[in-house]
Curated annotation (Swiss-Prot):
Chain intervals for the UniProt region annotation (Interaction with CDK2): 64-106
Keyword Magnesium: no
Lineage, uppermost ranks: Eukaryota, Metazoa, Chordata, Craniata, Vertebrata
Protein family (similarity comment): Belongs to the CDK2AP family.
Assembly information from the UniProt record: Component of the nucleosome remodeling and deacetylase (NuRD) repressor complex, composed of core proteins MTA1, MTA2, MTA3, RBBP4, RBBP7, HDAC1, HDAC2, MBD2, MBD3, and peripherally associated proteins CDK2AP1, CDK2AP2, GATAD2A, GATAD2B, CHD3, CHD4 and CHD5. The exact stoichiometry of the NuRD complex is unknown, and some subunits such as MBD2 and MBD3, GATAD2A and GATAD2B, and CHD3, CHD4 and CHD5 define mutually exclusive NuRD complexes. Interacts with CDK2AP1. Interacts with CDK2. Interacts with MAPK1.
InterPro entries linked: DOC_1/2
Source organism per UniProt: Homo sapiens (Human)
Keywords, sorted A to Z: Cytoplasm, Nucleus, Phosphoprotein
Record-level GO BP terms: negative regulation of G1/S transition of mitotic cell cycle; regulation of microtubule cytoskeleton organization; regulation of stem cell division
Annotated compartments: Cytoplasm; Nucleus
PTM statement from Swiss-Prot or TrEMBL: Phosphorylated by MAPK1 and CDK2.
Gene Ontology cellular component terms for the protein in this record: cytoplasm; microtubule; nucleus; NuRD complex
Designated gene of the protein: CDK2AP2
Role summary: Acts as a component of the histone deacetylase NuRD complex which participates in the remodeling of chromatin. Inhibits cell cycle G1/S phase transition by repressing CDK2 expression and activation; represses CDK2 activation by inhibiting its interaction with cyclin E and A. Plays a role in regulating the self-renewal of embryonic stem cells (ESCs) and in maintaining cell survival during terminal differentiation of ESCs. Regulates microtubule organization of metaphase II oocytes.
Tissue: Ubiquitous.
Protein name: Cyclin-dependent kinase 2-associated protein 2
Length: 126
């Protein structure tokens, strides 16, 4: 394999509309984080939601009308535990993002366990 030098970046010509790498960009023309045209009024929306339990990378299925609450909660718990199992090895290898996903999964699993226990107690009373 031979070494090939990196070609220099193309410089902008005086008539071009795109600034070169060394040209300062005026602050009024910096694009918004949402990718819209500046001043268009489209608000910035993050790609994730901080409210509620984490999704752990899977989409929760819609519950059918006749489904029992405890069965679907138990199924959700099993899928969360399965997803958490995939994060163990990367966490040991030092992955910070896997560690954060594992933490969120533990929090989500604890909430689901509480739901399952509450459902069991309700069923025991009847």
């Amino acid at each position: 394999m031979s070494y090939k030098p990196i070609a220099p970046a193309p410089s902008s010509t005086p008539g071009s509309s795109t600034p070169g790498p060394g040209t300062p960009v005026p602050t009024g023309s910096v694009p918004s984080p949402s990718g819209s045209v500046p001043g268009a009024g489209a608000p910035f929306r993050p790609l994730f939601n901080d409210f509620g339990p984490p999704s752990m990378g899977y989409v929760q299925a819609m519950k059918p009308p006749g489904a029992q609450g405890s069965q679907s909660t138990y199924t959700d718990l099993l899928s969360v535990i399965e997803e958490m199992g995939k994060e163990i090895r990367p966490t040991y290898a030092g992955s910070k993002s896997a560690m954060e996903r594992l933490k969120r999964g533990i929090i989500h699993a604890r909430a689901l366990v509480r739901e399952c226990l509450a459902e069991t107690e309700r069923n025991a009373r009847t």
